[in-house]
Structures are given as C-alpha cells and as structure tokens.
Amino acid sequence: MGLPKEHRLKHWRDFKTIYSQGKRFRGDALAIILLPQPAAPTKIGISISRKVSKKAVVRNLIKRRIRHACRTLLPQIQPGWHIVIAVRYNARECEYEHFLQELKRLLIQAEVFHGH
C-alpha cells in the first residue's frame, strides 16, 4: 500500500522546483529536500537513481520500504511541505527500521516533525 493520493508528489515540475529551491538535509542512506507550500497538504516524492542499483527490483523494494516509513510518519509531519526523499547509494543494505529512524531524524533536523 502506497501513500494516500493527496500526499503524493507526481509531476516532474514539482520535483524540479523542489530540487532547485528546497532546503537539503543529508543522512547515510537518505537525503531530503523540503520546500514550504503553506496552503497545501504535505506531499512526498521519492527519487532513486540507477546508481543505487541497476536492478529495478532492488530499486522498487527500497521505494516500498521508504513509502511504508513515510506512511508511518505522515501523521506527525507538519502540513504545508513538499518533500523529496533522495535515496543514496548506502540504502541498498538498509532495512525498513533503518529508513524509519533516519527519516525521522532528518525530519526532526528539518524542524517539520511534530513534538520536536
């Protein structure tokens, strides 16, 4: 099960805008780029390069794990943000729990996580 439709970033223009104007935070396996969008619900997109893995099966597995972590954390993320999660090379060895912890840490660092 993926993210709810109203929380998905889909269009390449949105990704391009976020990459060019957003604020970046880096971790071991993930990087997040954030751009405030005050009148909109929080939307999340995932970007993964072939440099992470040549195999689509591996890339899709990583994306599914990250989407699950996003779905878990979504109720605690402040509304009004567009977020791109860029997967880094080290993500190949990571499990769901690692993605969940790292994503939470990056969101706290970016000050968009409720309660921190």
Swiss-Prot record:
One of its GO terms (molecular function) is 3'-tRNA processing endoribonuclease activity. It comes from Picosynechococcus sp. (strain ATCC 27264 / PCC 7002 / PR-6). This is Ribonuclease P protein component. It is an enzyme of class 3 (hydrolase). Transmembrane segments: none annotated. Its EC number is 3.1.26.5. It comes from the Bacteria. The gene is rnpA. Pfam families: Ribonuclease_P. Keywords: Endonuclease, Hydrolase, Nuclease, RNA-binding, tRNA processing. It catalyses: Endonucleolytic cleavage of RNA, removing 5'-extranucleotides from tRNA precursor. Consists of a catalytic RNA component (M1 or rnpB) and a protein subunit.
